Regions:
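Alpha/beta-hydrolase fold catalytic core
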Residues: 1-22, 44-46, 84-85, 255-267
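Conserved HGGG/HGGXW glycine-rich cap/lid loop of the alpha/beta-hydrolase fold
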Residues: 7-64
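Active-site loop/oxyanion-hole signature of alpha/beta-hydrolase fold enzymes
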Residues: 40, 49-94, 255
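Flexible "cap/lid" loop of the alpha/beta hydrolase fold
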Residues: 100-105, 111-142
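Conserved alpha/beta-hydrolase catalytic His-Asp/Glu region
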Residues: 124-126, 142-201
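Short beta-strand/loop motif that positions the catalytic acidic residue
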Residues: 203, 209-211, 215
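Conserved alpha/beta-hydrolase "acid-adjacent" motif
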Residues: 216-222
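Catalytic active-site module of serine/aspartate enzymes centered on a nucleophile-bearing elbow/loop
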Residues: 232-267
Length: 267
């Protein structure tokens, strides 16, 4: 199993396929295993790199290291270990935070950026309020109820259960107290850690904002607003999908992502 070294920790990653590189970055309810519906489709034409973000899955670290700067350094360390200088970043939720921060701080490493159901750690009142409400309801709903759309829960119960099982690979699901994990999430989105809204005008790489029509955390109307701030960006709305469109509607999301990369990525 390959690991990359970064800031005193070992980061688990996998590489498969050949072609221009794509780095897949999971959300806070998942890990590298969650991209199983993307890899068979992308790998015939792309080098696909998945990783367990620090504190998730096999990238073991104390929850006190849950920090966006660490995540960016880790992503670059994984690319270096894989021998990749430049990649398209596909980030879901938390992974989108990492993608945006990397695009701003290290534009030479990012060929394109696709933010999937991500509030982007942006200092936007509607997005911050949605995240705060999600923390309040954390104990009242299961991971699949919080992250998947109503249509998917009603029609794909088996895959919804698989989503929950993938999450259970993470220490946050079984060995970290809710209060400690919630504090880590809140700390990562502290006022001094947020990305200013006006920073979006500095994003230089081709950018896609993809969102599920039923996403309770990332409203479509806010994504339309952010699209206006990211020069040349595109918006894709996935019908009847919640906060995990890539998992709920993989065929549609894969088509949108591959088309975007083919047309816009600067590998």
């Amino acid at each position: 199993m390959p690991f990359a070294e970064s800031r005193g920790r070992r980061l688990y990653y996998e590489r498969q396929g050949e072609g221009p590189a794509v780095l897949f970055l999971h959300g806070a309810g998942s890990n590298a295993a969650t991209w199983w519906q993307q890899l068979p489709v992308f790998s015939p034409r792309h080098t696909c790199i998945t990783m367990d973000i620090r504190c998730f899955g096999r990238s073991v670290a104390p929850v006190q290291e849950f920090d966006l700067d660490n995540f960016v350094a880790d992503a670059l360390a994984v690319l270096d270990a894989a021998g990749v200088q430049r990649a398209a970043f596909v980030g879901q939720s938390l992974g989108g935070f990492v993608g945006l921060k990397t695009a701003l701080a290290h534009p030479e490493r990012v060929a394109a950026f696709a933010a999937c159901d991500s509030s982007l750690a942006i200092d936007h009142p509607v997005l911050l309020d949605a995240i705060a409400r999600r923390r309040i309801t954390h104990k009242a709903a299961s991971i699949e109820q919080r992250s998947l759309g109503r249509w998917f829960l009603e029609n794909c119960a088996d895959k919804a259960q698989l989503y929950a099982q993938i999450n259970h690979f993470n220490p946050s699901a079984h060995s970290i107290p809710d209060g400690e994990w919630g504090a880590a999430l809140a700390g990562a989105l502290g006022a001094d850690k947020l990305i200013p809204l006006d920073a979006l005008c500095r994003v230089a790489c081709p950018t896609l904002l993809l969102v599920g029509s039923e996403d309770p955390i990332v409203p479509v109307r806010v994504m339309r607003e952010l699209q206006d701030l990211v020069r040349g960006s595109e918006l894709a709305v996935i019908d009847q999908a919640g906060h995990s469109a890539y998992f709920e509607k993989p065929d549609e999301v894969n088509r949108v992502l591959l088309d975007f990369l083919e047309r816009r990525a600067k590998f």
